[in-house]
Amino acid sequence: MRKLLWKIPRDYYRCNQCFGFTLIPKLSPEELNELYSDYYLEDSSNMEAFTDGCSDNWIKKYKLTINYFRTQKLDSKNFLDFGCGVDGYGLQVAKENGLTVSGLEVSAKTRAILRANTNCRIFSPDELQVSSELFDFILLSDVLEHATSPSLILEQAIQHLAENGVLLIQGPLEGTNNFTNLFLRIYSYLTPAKVADFLPYHVSLANQKSIQSLLKTNGLKIEKIRITETWWPAPKTLSSFRALPKVLPQIIAKLLDFSVSYLLPNYGSRFWLVASKNSK
């Protein structure tokens, strides 16, 4: 994969066992605080815009979770959105399905916005750490790819999972073998002098094998898993015709990925799963 330059040169290294990728050198706590600043807070403090924006977006992003909730008895069950983000979609989905809802968020500003917009209890990491409360459902939606240690995140979540509770986990499979990543590897090979300068929000790039290995290592068993294809990260619009030579191969690669995903059920760049504690 292409070298990334953010403050210092960094590379994504592949694990020889699970074939997932990790960004090395890892981000320091100070760099993480800088990275996740007010960027995620733009246009999210307006209650009317927040409410209007949720309806369509949460249905698209949380369709599988919504369908899963419809098969469960949710009376008197509680729910924790572990790393809910400023949009609060996961909180809204759980509230719509009658669950008693709480969230966890690192940023104090984000917590304040979420409390105002959702009327939910939002923990800070320190508050959750000292809490003895257990949850029937814990959601990690697009969280693990941001973590320098996904295993540590899972450990923290499991500490607050009820005995018969389940984890609902979803996110991208950026380390999978597909046409999109093949195009990116070829492009990197043909342009070795170029260095990526995007902000490293995603530092752990998973594939299906690495996700399964991560859960097994942390004493979890997968009850359900769905692999799907999404348009991301291919561009949705063309900024200029000069960009066409680069954009067109990406679009073609993504169309090929969609075509294969219709034929192979475990082919795709996004996962959703339900996991529980392994009693064995």
Name these PLM-found stretches.
Residues 140, 148-159, 166-276:
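S-adenosyl-L-methionine-dependent methyltransferase catalytic module, highlighting the catalytic core
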